UniProtKB/Swiss-Prot annotation:
Catalyzed reaction equations: (2R)-2,3-dihydroxy-3-methylbutanoate = 3-methyl-2-oxobutanoate + H2O; (2R,3R)-2,3-dihydroxy-3-methylpentanoate = (S)-3-methyl-2-oxopentanoate + H2O
Active site (UniProt): S473 (proton acceptor)
InterPro entries reported for this sequence: Dihydro-acid_dehy_C (IPR042096), DihydroxyA_deHydtase (IPR004404), DiOHA_6PGluconate_deHydtase_CS (IPR020558), ILV_EDD_C (IPR056740), ILV_EDD_N (IPR000581), IlvD/EDD_N (IPR037237)
N6-carboxylysine: modified positions: K123
Protein name per the record: Dihydroxy-acid dehydratase
Cofactor section: [2Fe-2S] cluster; Mg(2+)
Species the sequence originates in: Chlorobium limicola (strain DSM 245 / NBRC 103803 / 6330)
Stored PANTHER family: D-XYLONATE DEHYDRATASE (PTHR43661), D-XYLONATE DEHYDRATASE YAGF-RELATED (PTHR43661:SF3)
Organism superkingdom: Bacteria
C-alpha cells in the first residue's frame, strides 16, 4: 500500500505517533488497513455544499465498516452565483486549478491509498477530477446532489435563472421590486446544486458517463434519502477499488470521454463542460482536439431538454424519468455512438450499468426517433472571428436566432456591457461583443450570466446575440457564443472588432464571421497596444501568466512550457 510509506517500519514511529494524535486511528491494527481520504468540499457559502459535512460523516462511517481508515480533508470552493457580476467571478475558473493542486498536495503528502471525492458545484467537480487523474490512485466520486426547483406562492416553477432574468424585467418596469423579491425568495428552496442543467449538474451527470461515479450521482436530489445511500455505497466501493488497484486512468479513457461528450450533447449541458472535459483529458494525457466535437454532435440526438433550455423541466424531473442511465440507454440505440464496454467504478461496464434502465416519462426524455433536434445541444463554431473555435449551447437558442447577421456593439469589459444593456443602448438585431474577458484577459474567463439574463429580461433574447472570449453560466440561454479563441488579450480577431462591423452567426453551418477583409483585421490587430494585465498581484496575476487558451481547456502550464510556445 502507498500508505506504508508513512506507517510501516520502526523508523516510522514518529509518523504513527502523529497519526494516532488525529484520533482517526482506533488501534494499531488500523496501520494494516488502507488509508482513504474523504476529499470533502463542505462550506457555508455555497448552497450546493452546505450539507456536505453530513455526507462526509456518512462516508467515514462506511469506509471504516468496509475495512479502511478514513481521513477527511476539505478543498476550497466558489459559488458562481454569489461571485457573479463582480471581481469574484474572476476567481471562479481559476479556483479549479487551486482545487486540483490542493487535492494533489494532500493525497501525495500523506500517501493516501484512495479517495472518496465529495464535490457538487461548478469548479469543484472538475478540479477534483483533474487531481484524481494526475495522482492516479483509486478514486470514486459522489456529489452532493441537485437542489429542488423553487415554486412561487402562485404555483410558478422557478430557479436561480428566473431571479437573474427577473432583474432585467424589473429594470424595464415589467415587474415590481416586490414581485422580484417574491421570485428571489422562492427560487432556491434549500441545499443542493442549482436545479437546472447548469454547469454543476452537467458535470455531476457526466461523472456517470465517465464511469467515475455510481448511477444516480447526477440526478438524485440533495434532500432525497437515496443521496445518503449513494454515499454509503460509494464509500464501501472505494475499499474494493483500492484492494483491486483500479485507478482513474483505467476508467477515464478516450472512449469514456466520448461517451461523456455524447451524453453532454444529448442533454444540452453547460458550455463549461467542454472547457472542463478538455482539461480532464489533458490530465489523463489523452489527445483530444476541440475540432472533433462537431462530428460527435452531428450524430448525437438532442433528447433531453432541461432548464435553462426550457423553464418547466429540472433535474428532479430527469431523475423521475429514469435519470442519466435512461438517457444513456436511449442513446445506446444509436449505432456506434456509445462504447458500452467502457469500465466503471461499479466493477461493471457502462453497458451493464444501464442494462436495466428505462425511460419513464417521454415528455422529459424523448426517443431517438423524436428528438428535439437530430444533432446535439452544443456546438463549436469556426470562422475568421474565431479561427481556433467558439462554443454555443444550441439547445438554448431560439429558432429565429440560428442564423443572424447584425452590427457589433463592442464592449471591453462585462461591466461596460451590463451598463449599456441596462441603459437601453442595445437594439433588436445587435450583436453584443464583450472582449478582454478571456482566461488571460479577464483574468479568469468570467461568466456572462448577468448580461445574458439582462438581455432576456428586457425582451431581446429572440433578436440579440452575444459573443465573448469569456464564458457563460450553465444557466445562460439565447444566442450566446463564448470561449472565442484566440482571445482579445492574445490579439485574436475579436480584438479587431469595432462598433458597426457586421457579424454573421450561422449555427447550422457551425460558422461565425465578421464581414471584413483579412487585411483589415490584420491591420487593426497590428495597431493594437500591448495588452496590459488588469490584475498585477496575487493568485490571479500568476494565473494570467500561466493559463492557456479556452480551446485547450484553459489549463495552466508551467512557465518553461509557456515560453517554449
Amino acid at each position: 500500500m502507498r500508505s506504508d510509506t508513512v506507517k510501516t517500519g520502526f523508523e516510522k514511529a514518529p509518523h504513527r505517533s502523529l497519526l494516532k494524535a488525529t484520533g482517526a486511528i482506533a488501534s494499531n491494527n488500523d496501520f494494516r488497513k488502507p488509508f482513504i481520504g474523504i476529499c470533502n468540499s463542505f462550506n457555508e457559502l455555497i448552497p450546493g455544499h452546505a450539507h456536505l459535512q453530513e455526507l462526509g460523516r456518512i462516508a467515514k462511517e462506511e469506509v471504516r465498516k468496509a475495512g479502511g481508515v478514513p481521513f477527511e480533508f476539505n478543498t476550497i470552493g466558489v459559488c458562481d452565483g454569489i461571485a457573479m457580476g463582480h471581481i469574484g467571478m474572476r476567481y471562479s475558473l481559476a479556483s479549479r486549478e487551486l482545487i486540483a493542486d490542493s487535492v494533489e498536495t494532500v493525497a501525495e503528502a500523506h500517501r493516501l491509498d484512495g479517495l472518496v471525492c465529495i464535490p457538487n458545484c461548478d469548479k469543484i467537480t472538475p478540479g477534483m477530477m483533474m487531481a484524481a487523474l494526475r495522482i492516479n490512485i483509486p478514486v470514486i466520486f459522489v456529489s452532493g446532489g441537485p437542489m429542488k426547483a423553487g415554486c412561487t406562492p402562485s404555483g410558478k416553477t422557478v430557479d436561480l435563472i428566473s431571479v437573474f432574468e427577473a432583474v432585467g424585467q424589473c429594470s424595464t418596469g415589467e415587474i415590481t421590486e416586490s414581485e422580484l423579491e417574491t421570485i428571489q425568495d422562492s427560487a432556491c428552496p434549500g441545499c443542493g446544486s442549482c436545479s437546472g442543467m447548469f454547469t454543476a449538474n452537467s458535470m455531476n451527470c457526466l461523472s456517470e458517463a465517465l464511469g467515475i461515479a455510481l448511477p444516480g450521482n447526477g440526478t438524485i436530489l440533495a434532500i432525497d434519502p437515496r443521496r445518503n445511500e449513494l454515499v454509503r455505497e460509494a464509500s464501501r466501493k472505494i475499499v474494493d477499488l483500492v484492494n483491486n488497484d483500479i485507478r482513474p486512468r483505467d476508467i477515464i479513457t478516450r472512449k469514456s470521454l466520448l461517451n461523456a461528450f455524447a451524453l453532454d450533447f444529448a442533454m444540452g449541458g453547460s458550455t463549461n463542460t467542454i472547457l472542463h472535459t478538455l482539461a480532464i483529458a489533458n490530465e489523463a494525457e489523452l489527445d483530444f482536439d476541440f475540432s472533433e466535437l462537431n462530428a460527435l454532435s452531428a450524430k448525437t440526438p438532442y433528447i433531453c431538454k432541461v432548464s435553462p433550455a426550457t423553464m418547466d423541466v429540472h433535474i428532479e424531473d430527469v431523475d423521475r424519468a429514469g435519470g442519466i442511465s435512461a438517457i444513456l440507454k436511449e442513446l445506446s440505440r444509436v449505432d456506434g455512438l456509445l462504447d458500452l464496454s467502457a469500465p466503471t467504478v461499479t466493477g461493471k461496464t457502462l453497458g451493464e450499468n444501464i442494462a436495466g434502465a428505462e425511460v419513464l416519462d417521454r415528455n422529459v426524455i424523448r426517443s431517438i426517433e423524436n428528438p428535439y433536434s437530430a444533432t446535439g445541444g452544443l456546438a463549436v463554431l469556426y470562422g475568421n472571428l474565431a479561427p481556433q473555435g467558439a462554443v454555443i449551447k444550441t439547445g438554448a437558442v431560439s429558432p429565429e436566432m440560428m442564423t443572424h447577421t447584425g452590427p457589433a456593439k463592442v464592449y471591453d469589459s462585462q461591466d461596460e456591457a451590463i451598463k449599456g444593456i441596462m441603459d437601453g443602448d442595445i437594439c433588436a438585431g445587435d450583436v453584443v461583443v464583450i472582449r478582454y474577458e478571456g482566461p488571460k484577459g479577464g483574468p479568469g474567463m468570467p461568466e456572462m450570466l448577468s448580461p445574458t439574463s439582462a438581455i432576456m429580461g428586457r425582451g431581446l433574447g429572440g433578436s440579440v446575440a452575444l459573443i465573448t472570449d469569456g464564458r457563460f453560466s450553465g444557466g445562460s440561454r439565447g444566442a450566446c457564443i463564448g470561449h472565442v479563441s484566440p482571445e482579445a488579450a492574445e490579439k485574436g480577431p475579436i480584438a479587431a472588432l469595432e462598433n458597426g462591423d457586421m457579424i454573421t452567426i450561422d449555427i447550422p453551418n457551425r460558422c461565425i464571421s465578421v464581414d471584413l477583409p483579412e487585411t483589415v483585421i490584420a491591420g487593426r490587430i497590428a495597431a493594437l497596444k500591448p495588452f496590459e494585465p488588469k490584475i498585477k498581484k496575487g493568485y490571479l496575476a500568476r494565473y494570467a501568466q500561466l493559463v492557456t487558451s479556452a480551446n485547450t481547456g484553459a489549463i495552466m502550464k508551467n512557465p518553461a512550457y509557456c515560453e517554449s510556445k
